[in-house]
Amino acid sequence: MELTKQKTIDGVVQRDYALEVEGDTVPCVVWSREGAPPAPVLICMGHGGSQHKKTAGIRARALDYARRHGWVTLAIDAPGHGDRISRDQAATLAREVGARVRGVGGAQPFDAERMRAMLERSRRAIPEWKAALDATLALDCVGDDPAIGYWGVSMGTAIGVPFVASEPRIRCAVFGLAGLRPGAADFADAAKRIEIPVQFVFQWDDAVAPREHGIALFDAFGSKNKTMHINPGGHVEIPGFERDAWLAFYERHLG
């Protein structure tokens, strides 16, 4: 993993890396508290569709986790997102995703073609996440055998569920804003294999993930320690207090 850029933001070091995985360059970013001892906790954050590794919500929580708790956060650009595409491609993707989020008539439905595209993106992203995690664990800012958690909603869940199911080092996970659709047998199997603590956040009026699919995904998780938080509103209207719930969840399970 090659360091490409570094800056300090109010006591938090933000390091950009380039990681070669199976012939692709994966842009990564790691946040850690400046001058702190090696972190005992590492959070992996997966962004949503049309977003990127430094999207506002991820960056804000990564900075807060570093400042207040001394935790390290890792994020990567998913295939077809962030620094892996041009600005024009990113703008087109944002318009398409925005139309689906708003439930605009004529927005591309989640049909068989989109499901295949998502499965292919997840297939590519899983080894990338594993390689990024391996490389981050070797950094001086991360302690020996840290407690590792995952956070990812929407596309961060679509990729995160199969990733977490295949990654025994992760001790707990926050998912949400996604569902289990008919015919998604592999996704259902991955959810069933997740037996670590899970917190699942969902919006009751989500135009992207119908409520029956969200409930089906929550039910599919194999964990006996799982909680579903349902709030009114659309896909991008998660209440701010859920961020406090995520922090409390990590404190409870990662120490």
Residue ranges and their predicted role:
Residues 127-193:
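Primarily recognizes the serine-hydrolase "nucleophile elbow" in alpha/beta-hydrolase
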